[in-house]
From Swiss-Prot:
<dbReference type="InterPro" id="IPR020568">
    <property type="entry name" value="Ribosomal_Su5_D2-typ_SF"/>
</dbReference>
<comment type="similarity">
    <text>Belongs to the RnpA family.</text>
</comment>
<comment type="subunit">
    <text>Consists of a catalytic RNA component (M1 or rnpB) and a protein subunit.</text>
</comment>
<dbReference type="InterPro" id="IPR000100">
    <property type="entry name" value="RNase_P"/>
</dbReference>
<keyword id="KW-0255">Endonuclease</keyword>
<dbReference type="GO" id="GO:0004526">
    <property type="term" value="F:ribonuclease P activity"/>
</dbReference>
<dbReference type="GO" id="GO:0030677">
    <property type="term" value="C:ribonuclease P complex"/>
</dbReference>
<comment type="function">
    <text>RNaseP catalyzes the removal of the 5'-leader sequence from pre-tRNA to produce the mature 5'-terminus. It can also cleave other RNA substrates such as 4.5S RNA. The protein component plays an auxiliary but essential role in vivo by binding to the 5'-leader sequence and broadening the substrate specificity of the ribozyme.</text>
</comment>
<keyword id="KW-0694">RNA-binding</keyword>
<dbReference type="GO" id="GO:0001682">
    <property type="term" value="P:tRNA 5'-leader removal"/>
</dbReference>
<dbReference type="InterPro" id="IPR014721">
    <property type="entry name" value="Ribsml_uS5_D2-typ_fold_subgr"/>
</dbReference>
<keyword id="KW-0540">Nuclease</keyword>
<protein>
    <recommendedName>
        <fullName>Ribonuclease P protein component</fullName>
        <ecNumber>3.1.26.5</ecNumber>
    </recommendedName>
</protein>
<dbReference type="GO" id="GO:0042781">
    <property type="term" value="F:3'-tRNA processing endoribonuclease activity"/>
</dbReference>
<dbReference type="Pfam" id="PF00825">
    <property type="entry name" value="Ribonuclease_P"/>
</dbReference>
<keyword id="KW-0378">Hydrolase</keyword>
<dbReference type="GO" id="GO:0000049">
    <property type="term" value="F:tRNA binding"/>
</dbReference>
Length: 119
């Protein structure tokens, strides 16, 4: 049975972890969100989030996006290969409600899964 938690070991925590992902990543994106991915040598996937104040001024909006992003990752982590992921938000992210954001992320995760299976 797959554990669906989001413990500390499932997060990208240090700048060096993020730098690794930014070097030659697999990229899937929409106008509002980009997900970068890079293979890791662990037995699980990890997630890092970047939500800029430039795109979402209020903290509660940034927290909402991060909360929904973590939840979508948590639910699909059993299907995701051993990759490190960084979710980068873009300008139109504030226009999406919770359901649209979750659907967009789900679509991007599924696109990533197909991309990995092809390669």
């Amino acid at each position: 049975m797959v554990k669906l938690g989001f413990s500390r070991e499932l997060r990208l925590l240090t700048p060096s972890h993020f730098k690794c992902v930014f070097q030659k990543p697999l990229r899937v994106s929409t106008p509002e969100i980009t997900i970068l991915a890079r293979k890791n040598n662990l037995e699980h996937s990890r997630l890092g989030l970047t939500v800029a104040k430039k795109h979402l001024k209020r903290a509660h909006d940034r927290n909402r996006v991060k909360r929904i992003s973590r939840e979508s990752f948590r639910l699909l982590q059993g299907q995701l290969a051993n990759y490190d992921f960084v979710i980068i938000t873009k300008k139109g992210i504030g226009n999406l409600d919770n359901q649209q954001l979750f659907q967009t992320l789900d679509k991007l995760w599924k696109r990533h899964i197909r991309l990995v299976q092809k390669s």
